[in-house]
Amino acid sequence: MTSTFFKYSVLLLPALINLAAFLTNFQTNTLPVEPINLYLSNFVHSDFYHLTGNIVVYIVSAFLSFIFFRNSDMKGFSGYLLPSYSFLYHI
């Protein structure tokens, strides 16, 4: 029960981040598209944050692949636990 909860709660993180950004910008009563775009552009274009973002994405995707595939028939094969680097954003 709890493993299923954690498995699907990770998928709600973008919605929770947007909700938190909306609640912090409640004076304008609009979705904070500009602050989010500014944050993402700063996040992508800075070398340190770019490296940190790639590491975080790799760790999260490895964790998710472990959760989703740990009960599969390929339990002895450890290669499926590690995601490929093809999805990482490189400038």
Curated annotation (Swiss-Prot):
CC annotations in GO: plasma membrane
Transmembrane segments: 5-27, 47-69
Keywords recorded for this protein, A-Z: Cell membrane, Membrane, Transmembrane, Transmembrane helix
Membrane topology: Multi-pass membrane protein
Subcellular location: Cell membrane
Source taxon at top rank: Archaea
The name this protein goes by in its record: Uncharacterized protein AF_2352
